[in-house]
Amino acid sequence: MKRTSVFLMVVLALMLTTSIAFASPATQATIVTRLSGAEEVPPRDTDAQGIVLLKPSSDGTSLDYRLIVAKIENVTAAHIHCGPAGENGPVGVTLYHGGLPGSGPVDGVLSAGTATAPDAGNACGWETIQDVLDAMATGNTYVNVHTNDGVAPTNTGPGDFPGGEIRGQIQ
């Protein structure tokens, strides 16, 4: 319980800091999405959780992001996928890549940056960040954090869900 309270306080502090950092009269509101194993398809039994902050530019050409996670291990990747709630879809924008299987626990900011284009050749059909923003506006996008402990078989429990351990529908 104490660890969850500390996590929530850290998230709130980061949200305030991020809001200040992203603030400018010409930009749009920050989108906040909570990530959990319950949102995965199929649902995952995990204590891992996360939050992603997304801030589109006023001209629709870029998307600032900050992905914060807690109680998660062996993160290998995180993406924005296209797809409605309750369905899995392809990767459209990479938020984090390069974590090695079996890399251990992560608590805090997993990744932060600015996306200026979706992944080249993505199966969502997105060619520009505006395409991503349009899909977000219709509820057809989600953030997924993938894990892998590097030991066969896969999907054996927390820290070993290559298809995704925590997810949140962007709304």
Where are these regions (language model features)?
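Metal-centered catalytic cores of metalloenzymes
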Residues: 16, 20-78, 82-171
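Cleavable N-terminal signal peptides
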Residues: 10-11, 21
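Low-complexity intrinsically disordered segments
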Residues: 1, 14-15
